[in-house]
Amino acid sequence: MADPKDISPCKNEDLFLKCRSTLITGVLLPDKTRSDIWYDETGTIRTCGPDIARNHRNEADIILDGSGFLAMPGLINTHTHAAMTLLRGYADDMHLQQWLSEKIWPLEAHLTGEHVYWGTKLACLEMIRSGTIAFNDMYFYMKDAARAVQESGIRAVLSHGIITFGDEAKMEAELKATEDLVHHVRSLNTSLITSAIAPHAPYTVPPQHLEVCADYSQKEKIIIHTHLAETKQEVDDCQKSYGMTPAALLDKTGCLTERTVAAHGCWLSEDDCRLLAERRVSVAHNPVSNMKLATGRAMPYHWLKDQGVNVCLGTDGCSSNNNLDMLEEMKTAALCQKFFWNSDTLLPAAEALSMGTSWGAKALGYQGGVIQEGMPADIVLISLSHPSMVPLHNPVSNIAYSAEGSVVDTVICQGKILMYNRYIPDEEKIIAGARESADDLLNRAGIMA
């Protein structure tokens, strides 16, 4: 795949060290055109189109033969809890509130920063292997998560999950954790990692604390990452307590803005959807998690689409999915919408692809999610010899409906090659460290590993 004069062995570690001027030749694009792609040492696409190689071959440090591959934008996971990879398979087939209160929250009480580091390392590895180059993360010990993300080379928006249940001292501590994270992320001096404030949900963070979160987001110009209308019980309880829907409550407290990413939205009303459109909120669809936890209703994509809401895609955490494969999530989203709302044309393949790429970039506040001049070189190369990609009548259809993570051959983020020929440096070390960390977490909780 690579020009022998540059990188002969497919596992040459020099390939992964830094971003270098790179030329990808003769690669297929989703619109079935053949193209060359040239990006510079800053990781910015300089130009793409036919016959570019003829003029720029001598300027490239690395030349990749793309003739057997399909190039697509890197996938963007707009809602997850990355370090919950350590909880994969720990608690399944339970009611949501029982799952949270009896299993997840008690185990999370034993988490340390080292657990979060290894869980996030494992998450980044899994995401890279399946073509994801950016994610929006809400969890704990996020400085340790930042260390893992920086080592992995992908993009992330990191936030400390705020849960207060009205406790003022708790809110003070949670805000301090967020402030520390924001300052820490800025000190890293990298454009790949940014921060957000994350009030968990209107049922775990009361109005007076939601207002604090909204004010801090406005002050620091950072994303608000939250859960919204995931279950009917959440909506009913909010109506009973406050006389309004969770969406209306978030709006009243200032938490609905163009910087808000609201996950789930399964039980949004039509009025809620109009409100989200007016406030230019992005909604992250998490169909696998929603179906596994039996939320009872699919996110009303048709209402959101009709109102012009930006809808993106997320996996949620591995304890409720149980993987981070965005290609699988893309297919599930399309099928879930068609089935639940009884519409064979709802959420077609092209929209599912946008949901996992360019619409996700918009939600996270950066230009990207497309392969074109001036955009970040966030590129995934899919093997056209993989059985699920044959035949290739419609590349977009294959990406949305037949592909899964194993079709991904090469992953590039901001020009840096993170996976090449399915090889990622230190993969065995990461898996061993994560396995040991998961066992340690259970031992700390007094659970037999």
Swiss-Prot record:
Gene Ontology biological process terms in this record: S-adenosylmethionine biosynthetic process
Binding of Zn(2+), residues: 79, 81, 227, 316
Keywords: Hydrolase, Metal-binding, Zinc
Reactions listed under catalytic activity: 5'-deoxyadenosine + H2O + H(+) = 5'-deoxyinosine + NH4(+); S-adenosyl-L-homocysteine + H2O + H(+) = S-inosyl-L-homocysteine + NH4(+); S-methyl-5'-thioadenosine + H2O + H(+) = S-methyl-5'-thioinosine + NH4(+); adenosine + H2O + H(+) = inosine + NH4(+)
Subunit and interaction comment: Homotetramer.
Main function: Catalyzes the deamination of three SAM-derived enzymatic products, namely 5'-deoxyadenosine, S-adenosyl-L-homocysteine, and 5'-methylthioadenosine, to produce the inosine analogs. Can also deaminate adenosine. The preferred substrate for this enzyme is 5'-deoxyadenosine, but all these substrates are efficiently deaminated. Likely functions in a S-adenosyl-L-methionine (SAM) recycling pathway from S-adenosyl-L-homocysteine (SAH) produced from SAM-dependent methylation reactions.
Protein name, per record: 5'-deoxyadenosine deaminase
Native source species: Methanospirillum hungatei JF-1 (strain ATCC 27890 / DSM 864 / NBRC 100397 / JF-1)
Gene: dadD
